[in-house]
Curated annotation (Swiss-Prot):
GO terms for molecular function: alanine-tRNA ligase activity; aminoacyl-tRNA deacylase activity; ATP binding; tRNA binding; zinc ion binding. This is Alanine--tRNA ligase. The lineage of its organism: Bacteria, Pseudomonadati, Pseudomonadota, Betaproteobacteria, Neisseriales. Its cofactor is Zn(2+). Keywords: Aminoacyl-tRNA synthetase, ATP-binding, Cytoplasm, Ligase, Metal-binding, Nucleotide-binding, Protein biosynthesis, RNA-binding, tRNA-binding, Zinc.
Amino acid sequence: MKTSELRQKFLKFFETKGHTVVRSSSLVPHDDPTLLFTNAGMNQFKDVFLGFDKRPYSRATTAQKCVRAGGKHNDLENVGYTARHHTFFEMMGNFSFGDYFKRDAIHFAWEFLTSPEWLNIPKDKLLATVYAEDDEAYNIWLNEIGMPSERIVRIGDNKGAKYASDNFWQMGDTGPCGPCSEIFYDHGEEIWGGIPGSPEEDGDRWIEIWNCVFMQFNRDEQGNMNPLPKPSVDTGMGLERMAAVMQHVHSNYEIDLFQDLLKAVARETGAAFSMEEPSLKVIADHIRSCSFLIADGVLPSNEGRGYVLRRIIRRAVRHGYKLGQSKPFFHKLVADLVKEMGDAYPELKEKQVQIEEALKNEESRFAQTLETGMALLENALAKGSKKLDGEIIFKLYDTYGFPYDLTADICRERNIELDEAGFEREMEAQRARARAAQSFKANAQLPYDGQDTEFKGYSERQTESKVLALYKDGEQVDELNEGDSGAVVIDFTPFYAESGGQVGDVGYIFSGENRFEVRDTQKIKAAVFGQFGVQTSGRLKVGDSVTAKVDDEIRNANMRNHSATHLMHKALRDVLGRHVEQKGSLVTAESTRFDISHPQAVTAEEIAEVERRVNEAVLANVAVNAAIMSMEDAQKTGAMMLFGEKYGDEVRVLQMGGFSTELCGGTHVSRTGDIGLFKIISEGGIAAGVRRIEAITGLNALKWAQEQERLVKDIIAETKAQTEKDVLAKIQAGAAHAKALEKELARAKAELAVHAGAKLLDDAKDLGAAKLVAAQIEADAAALREIVTDLTGKSDNAVILLAAVNDGKVSLCAGVSKALTGKVKAGDLVKFAAEQVGGKGGGRPDLAQAGGTDAGKLPAVLDSVKDWVGAKLV
């Protein structure tokens, strides 16, 4: 049975049992700061289990994409070296939200595994474990399923505390928890290992294939186990493990999906295909996690999820290097993965080009430092120490881009221990430097437990309100006096709180002579807005009746830029391709800054086309309408949504005629014509695969255009051109003339250098076996090299060291006639001189260059060369 067939069978089985098939959630969890990546099927249902969310179904089944990698201590280093470790895997699951419980969960699992209609696994190949105190589950296995008692294993509290057991699941220190029952498959007595709970349980004979978690209790802060009113079920079955069972193989890497990927890896690296080669397995595993992460919006970076992705990519590239492939190859495997898994996960097909570009860019970036870093590491390992120094590990990490676990991987192959403590010291020193250099924005999270704020700002710019709370220095106070900086919470507010990339509104809150200047608006809680600013006159007290008024000019500018951003987003997708996704935005009164996923620079022609499309929509002057509707209705409108974002049951849909439909909670113009004019003023890369575009609107765009016009007129006047069309020709002619003069100057310098060099050789010091020239001249580094090469070519026994000082920096060049390189080496000579002037360098035995920073020591260094060379000639 192929892996793809097994996936479909599982979902079909549970669909026949009344379960709703729910598509896999993104690998990037939303609204769950406790998770780096989705790592289990239940992640997307966490709020349902906790009672915070309700679904229109009580039974669900999924094939969930999962990634388990992240943090220095993880299983990444084991991937490729064991039969079942992966960075990416699929978790098949069935879930009950207060519907069925233990009996049905166990019966469903048993039927799917053993029924001839489904998997038809021999019953005597299976074993079940239960929590020691879970008599209910034990009796279901024994009396209803008919499993022999010797193949039902009770597992107690084997982790040192009450309820701390392999067979007792807990979401956290408090909250839903309960016993679980695991199903194991026997790979055969020829494989070493014992049943769960035995001394040999870590062997590979008995492998867990399914875990059924019974959420039965709610653990309170005192540790009491209180029965849940509606117990639930969460199960998980690893697809790759189950495929190995169904295909009668022992290792996950032997299943059909991996066999095809392994052959592709061998093809692209030029390595011989062998199931004994860990590097092939590493790369085959890593192309899955990397491709799926990029498809779900993660891009390589130096922090968070992006850094985990970077680590995985670089580990794969290093293993390719180990197999002898030094050119970019990893991205070429994406097509093979799409062929294997694209039907089950259409996002792979949709994002194939983007995935390939992101991987190729990261490969190329790492290739620039991989060889140099490997040379440094090999040199350190060649010293024979059994432990790699922490400073070297840090240098590899900081300078050459070697993640810690990549270095650990290499050292593991050589049985070399890592100086982890030394590495941590270097890392902490770097973090301390970063903390000292960084300033932080004040935190808007203030203590508040009063009523929510009602936002009136979509339709009103001014409200009559009541002061609910006041803050000064982060603490609640009863009043703010003149000169006090703080925050105000009012019951009705026209001020938009920073959200969705749009900055918070500014304006005033006042009553009579009492005036508070609002300089920013932030959310203190989800539905509580804080107006931050300063009391410019009088006094403000809790309970005061006040007028809150938004600054119209700034609000209007914010609205123009925000509405223009929507039009630009749509135009970018139409012009550049459907792969374009929003990666970030900042809407202010001055401009809009928009970050998008795109593998290369946006061309001038593409920018012009985007501008044309946006301004066409502006000139159409269509109405901008907002409507609150259900998510289902919003999807029917074709509204653009942020990929992977989590939305509520009701959403706000913003429509601009036929030009743009998008979910948005921001403030916008009434008609597109209010934008006035749209102009992109900059475009550039901010990370691998991410471009940043900045644009302006309205009078700001007009002002920019007028400044450009003035600049062009100044250039026309300066170049004495007759018209704008003549300017370019004038500039090109001037540049050509300057280039010709530079060539003429270079020829003159070269001639002078040759003449100067001849005189230097005439004045050389005779050391018997050699003629020594050690002098400072006026020349650049290129001229120094040319002179030294010329002099050594004219003599069969010359030792030359020439120096020059340009902009306070020392340039050195040494040359030795080939007949003398057995005794005197140019690389050694230039290194000797460079170290004394605060620099370093080296090169070939006959020619070498270096630099330095201490020009004051140069005369003494040149004087010392005679003794140094003389000693070498003895």
